[in-house]
Amino acid sequence: MYFDAAAFCGHWPYYRVRNGKLEQMLEHYRAAGIESGFMSSLDAAFYQDPWEADQELVAQLAGTNWRVAMSVNPTMPWAEQLLLQGKEAGVGAVRLYPCLHGYGEDDPRVVKLCQLAGKLELPVIVTARMEDSRMCYLYVPRNPDMGRICNLARQCEDTRFLLSNCLATEVKALLPLPENLWLDTAGLRVDGFFENQQDIPPERFLFGSFAPLQCIRSSMCLLPENQKQQLMWENAQTFFEK
């Protein structure tokens, strides 16, 4: 059984995605041998009240090995209450979208929310980007600041962080990597990257497909065969044990 740390379902407002409905996504994941992971609602990322979409997703995933990575905008006045509500409902993680919502990773409200997530034992997923910036002619995404992301992790040392969909060219800016920061493989699918890079040990990466905005099968194809089990399952177990 494999684990996907960056799974999505729902509607992407800027173009139509194939097989974005939850039932379709779960079917495709099963066909790829992926039976568990963090599932995020694309709809929630754009709702004024993201819990309207996330609450529905929690109910739909009940009884499965999938957990919801809920959307929270730390700049909203009800962000902390929303986080407590999600914890009570059984979500598995918090996904932040500074790339969409326009706040800096060093915003005091972000730090405060992430510290609360640590107390609640909820991992925080920081989304570096949703898609290639060259495709973003309908909106202007905020580019990630790797230095600020590292500082955020250091300020919230009791919180586990997962950086999602960063680029291979951005990895060096994360060094030295904070002990509580992991990366998913979305955006890093450069042929030979995991075999050739020496800066971050392979146990600090979790598999992330970023489907349906990216392809599940191609996400798996460039993973080294001798590290696939580690990246797609074993590292997730270590991540949860921390």
Describe the predicted segments one by one:
Residues 50-55, 78-87, 106-107, 135-155, ...:
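Distinct, well-ordered alpha-helical segments
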Residues 160-242:
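H/E-rich (His + Asp/Glu) clusters that bind or coordinate divalent metals
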Residues 1-9, 13-36, 84-85, 202-204, ...:
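Mid-to-C-terminal alpha-helical segments outside catalytic/metal-binding sites
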Residues 11-14, 42-46, 92-105, 130-140, ...:
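Surface-exposed cleft-lining segments at the edges of enzyme active sites
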